[in-house]
Amino acid sequence: MRPMVFEYPCDPVAAYLETQYMLGDALLVAPVLREDKKVQYYLPEGRWTDYFTGEVKTGGRYYEGEYDYFSLPLYVKENTLLATGAVNDRPDYDYRDGATLHLYELADGATCTCRMVDVKGADVCTITAERRGGVYTLKADADMNGLTVMLHGICAEGVTAENARIHADSVSGCASAVISTSTREIKITLE
């Protein structure tokens, strides 16, 4: 958990943001602090995806919304590869087992990396995602069998993949690839 100014030292607004914070380097959190449930938050420059709804917003400005105590503004920064676990009722489990890798708004020519750790914090797998045109390549230093990769914010007529089964949803703007073979690299192509 870090103040906004640590992640965005060149953004003059970030120095004055006391009611929101960064969770790691990719998640922006703006807690509900008012009884009327209204939250005003600032998104720095770039594209930000609402973690819960998938709505994409442009940064460099303030937003306001009404939330209850079971929701809050939680945004994922563009060019982020975020791992989520399959178990949500306990903190100590094999995080890699059944995990989903969420790839948010990866720009053409960009790369991003995600480290997966065990319950003691030791690295078990590091995955790098790269985009070249309509081809997304994910490479890992360990076997990726059993993982799911979800691409957020895509528009494509067709999606194909090597070493994975594909499901594309044009309504949500997401495509997912379930890795069902022992491999350390997959390529997902958007058409």
Regions found by a protein language model. Give the residues of each.
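Surface-exposed interaction regions enriched in Ser/Thr/Asp/Glu
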Residues: 176-191
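Short, ordered beta-strand-loop transition motifs
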Residues: 34, 128-135, 166-174, 181
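Catalytic core of carbohydrate-active enzymes
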Residues: 1-154
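Conserved catalytic/binding loops enriched for acidic/polar residues
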Residues: 120-123, 159, 186
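Solvent-exposed beta-strand/loop surfaces of large extracellular or lumenal domains
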Residues: 51-69, 160-179
